[in-house]
Amino acid sequence: MKAEQQHTPMMQQYLRLKAENPDILLFYRMGDFYELFYDDAKKASQLLDISLTKRGASAGEPIPMAGVPFHAVEGYLAKLVQLGESVAICEQVGDPATSKGPVERKVVRIVTPGTVTDEALLSERLDNLIAAIYHHNGKFGYATLDVTSGRFQLVEPQSEEAMAAELQRTSPRELLFPEDFEPVHLMTGRNGNRRRPVWEFELETAKQQLNQQFGTKDLVGFGVENAMLGLCAAGCLIQYVKDTQRTALPHIRALTYDRQDDSVILDAATRRNLELTQNLAGGSDNTLAAVLDRCATPMGSRMLKRWIHQPMRCITTREHRLDAIAELKEQALFSDIHPVVKQIGDIERILARLALRSARPRDLARLRHAMQQLPELAQTLSSLGNSHLKSLATAAAPMDDVCELLERAIKENPPVVIRDGGVIAEGYSADLDEWRDLADGATGYLEKLEEEERDRHGIDTLKVGYNNVHGFYIQVSRGQSHLVPPHYVRRQTLKNAERYIIPELKEHEDKVLNSKSKALAIEKQLWEELFDLLLPHLARLQELAAAVAQLDVLQNLAERADTLDYCRPNLTKDPVVHITAGRHPVVEQVTSDPFIANPIELNSQRKMLIITGPNMGGKSTYMRQTALIALMAHIGSYVPAESATIGSIDRIFTRIGASDDLASGRSTFMVEMTETANILHNATANSLVLMDEIGRGTSTYDGLSLAWASAHWLATQIGAMTLFATHYFELTELPNQLPHLANVHLDAVEHGDSIAFMHAVQEGAASKSYGLAVAGLAGVPKTVIKNARQKLSQLELLSAEGSQPKARTVDIANQLSLIPEPSEVEQALASIDPDDLTPRQALEALYRLKKML
């Protein structure tokens, strides 16, 4: 006997469905619950903190079981999706009344972290991306898809560093990778990684899948036909999404090539250090996005974050945005646009659910409400003169046909789901209205029947009622049940009453129930037909949503510029960063003290600033604010300064702060050096580089040597615009030795045992570091500070005398190297081939080697 045949028919059905979905949790509908069995039950009980019970037996052992109520399933799904789990939803599709054996069930949808579209499972102000990654010969193909909007992009990073930066930028909720993927360390620490068969990434299969999706013969029109690695990833991705959604994907209409040359490249360390959308603790407070995002709609908020993470190099695009912001700011139109756009809401995600035919009645009611706001938006935008805003206003023009259809079709306040009807408005369908009238007319008939029966038999407690179990009934109190005539048939006995049925009432019940079920069937059919009527408008609706989202971002940036006193940056192609009275956009909002604004000047004659000054003096803030102002200028935003001229930047690098990477076995110093190596290899003359405290993780001489050499290389070989903060005062000599360098410092003033930080940037090098004063502020015991001052005096005296402490002599030139470099003699010996030498040449070589010793 097969193992499956040892189970009940219901469990046999479960095992067949589970075999089709072996790697994900299966929610198996049984009545009012979704049940899980075996290992799924054990896993779900731990993840969801629900009870683990038992049911029946398998091979003599009870079957583990856990369940969740169907009406509360969204909350449990949300928790599982947040944990990176995927769930197959199995529903009863057969009719229990006509089924022989178990009710027919099938998996109707698969919920995965990257493909969810339900509002309850999504963060409304964050993109929800699914991605696929492919690797070949050291290069990568990477595709991302936002199922909730239809945005489908691919990119081809040329190195692991670039690939890591893309993963950091996009933060996919789900990541597909082939079974033979080698650089698996890229996925360390990520939830939602999915291993897929290698054949799903085959190029020809991918092209076939994509052409089928877009209804095209080739991909030339999308400009991606030569992106072979990216297409391999995109093909796997579209197939996976089709498999999980179990439906067509009409809202995914194009695949775009995200060319990295078009944007300012930010590596993973830079995104982390600048705290763009996530702070160093992993939260969203005190980030650039937290300050800039006052968007009226979630879709506007998501677009703004995409802009922040992908600054544009194209000056024309940025000038268009700045021109639009200028007009909205000067005319204070943002205050008029904000409330109207807020009423439009997040139609982008509603349209995705419409495309997937998973939209609910209230989705379409919200879409109707959004359509009703468009005439007012058009009126508000009618006075605009800016060409970019005019084009957005045209794209967001009213769609009267869609609005009229939704107004006719959907009730004012529809229920949450279509299941029980009551969604389609009166007057939309004469057929539906007729059956509804028949069902609703029952109320008057029942009231009349109740009154007649009560008068006819003299039973004043007689009532006509209805429940789902027994249908219609006549109820009489126990005290008057003796008055009931013989043709009353008892249906139910209660504690204080009896319930009866009569032929006339039974006949009416059959008629009413039939009319209700008929009306519900017609309503569900009309609901499906409504999708068919709306889908031809999908492309136009998506364009409208994108235009409204961009209007929202622009009005938001105009409001921020006005409220926070930002200025319009002057954009130029020259490598220059000239800022007057610049401020850190985040720090100035969270500090209780007045923020000290500072200038900066970087240009072709002043490429590097050596920044010195005390800890807590503001060096890191000064560096970060420069990078953030440059980044804001590259998204087309106003900036926190009195004035700013920002040149075209190709990359922003930061080497600020570090911590041990314990998972990879890398020390603080190793992390620091890895980031430094990345900068020295990839920076160009058009890059903005922030280097903070290079070399602090090792000995003084090692650190000083590395800091000096790094600064020297950046200045002489690369010529990048560089802010180089250091505690090594020896580096302040560099501007005296090399052109295009300058010293600046942040100062402090000591008052006895206290210290006041000025936070003002001044020309020249700092005179001292104030390290002991900072230690005192931190609470280091005064005795320790006193001993430190004595030791400092001794060291300064020895340094002035030109000697080293006798306790330990450091031979700088002969430090132990992890990879010993060959001596001059060894190099000379290695270059000699004895078999090719005459006796005379051999003797001459020996004398040369002797001289080298």
Swiss-Prot record:
Pfam families: MutS_I (PF01624), MutS_II (PF05188), MutS_III (PF05192), MutS_IV (PF05190), MutS_V (PF00488). GO terms for biological process: mismatch repair. It comes from the Bacteria. GO terms for cellular component: cytosol. Keywords: ATP-binding, DNA damage, DNA repair, DNA-binding, Nucleotide-binding. CDD domains: ABC_MutS1 (cd03284). ATP binds at G613, P614, N615, M616, G617, G618, K619, S620. InterPro entries: DNA_mismatch_repair_MutS, DNA_mismatch_repair_MutS-lik_N, DNA_mismatch_repair_MutS/MSH, DNA_mismatch_repair_MutS_C, DNA_mismatch_repair_MutS_clamp, DNA_mismatch_repair_MutS_core, DNA_mismatch_repair_MutS_N, DNA_mismatch_repair_MutS_sf. One of its GO terms (molecular function) is ATP-dependent DNA damage sensor activity. This protein is involved in the repair of mismatches in DNA. It is possible that it carries out the mismatch recognition step. This protein has a weak ATPase activity. Belongs to the DNA mismatch repair MutS family. This is DNA mismatch repair protein MutS.
